[in-house]
């Protein structure tokens, strides 16, 4: 028997794939977007940019911006009863409307 893979992108065939017309990098405005401390954001992973990518299990979650570290934002999300801190590049974040 072969050993099961435990890689970062396992079980993400649909989650981290793009439509053929949407291939390539997103527009620059997505890279340069700014967020305020306390603002609510959605975590939507951009599969073509790997830096600052959160774990795929957090895709679709909503969190609160707590601060900034370099280019990345510090986002807190609630996972059950725990509060988890993630460091996410702004290309993987969308503001909540």
From Swiss-Prot:
Which Gene3D superfamilies does UniProt cross-reference here? Ribosomal protein L21
Cellular component terms (Gene Ontology)? ribonucleoprotein complex; ribosome
Q: Which UniProt keywords apply?
A: Ribonucleoprotein, Ribosomal protein
Q: Name one Pfam family in it.
A: Ribosomal_L21e
| A GO MF label | structural constituent of ribosome
Ranges of biased composition (kind: Basic residues): 1-24
| A single BP term in Gene Ontology | translation
- What protein name applies here? Large ribosomal subunit protein eL21
Which species is this UniProt entry from? Pyrococcus furiosus (strain ATCC 43587 / DSM 3638 / JCM 8422 / Vc1)
